[in-house]
From Swiss-Prot:
Assembly and oligomerization: Homodimer.
Family: Belongs to the DTD family.
CDD domains, A to Z: Dtyr_deacylase
Gene Ontology terms for molecular function: D-tyrosyl-tRNA(Tyr) deacylase activity; Gly-tRNA(Ala) deacylase activity; Ser(Gly)-tRNA(Ala) hydrolase activity; tRNA binding
Protein name: D-aminoacyl-tRNA deacylase
Record-linked Pfam families: Tyr_Deacylase (PF02580)
Protein's GO biological process: D-amino acid catabolic process
Annotated domain remarks: A Gly-cisPro motif from one monomer fits into the active site of the other monomer to allow specific chiral rejection of L-amino acids.
Origin organism lineage: Bacteria, Pseudomonadati, Pseudomonadota, Betaproteobacteria, Burkholderiales
UniProt organism field: Acidovorax sp. (strain JS42)
Amino acid sequence: MIGLLQRVREARVEVAGEIVGRIGPGLLALVCAEQGDSEAQADKLLAKMLKLRIFSDEAGKMNRSVQDLDGQGTCGGLLIVSQFTLAADTRGGNRPSFTQAAPPAQGERLYDYFVAQARAVHPMVATGRFAADMQVHLVNDGPVTLPLRIAPPG
């Protein structure tokens, strides 16, 4: 499973002009299920995402996670948006191939699972809409953008 994390001051996602998800300071997480992924990859990606220390402490060092933005236990927002294009293979020619992305039904099942698990352990979760044409608006903080990948077995 692939995640592209962006530390944001704020972010929102719109579908057909309607805001369907919005957060203040926190993480925008673009996520993609790959062929062979299961709940195990989703669990590992979420655990890493929530514990990753990419928010600054008082000294300006990246020592805080989205679960503790201020050192007092204040959680940041988590905006989760599905994006199958993260699995693009651009090695051949000029048109990307997306054959490594999970089939739509599997991708949606794992996305829904990922969101449910996030909501079970994090108080501020917003989402996009799976397979929708979305417009994502964000104010990057830093900018800090990190790719994460939990490889499928085999």
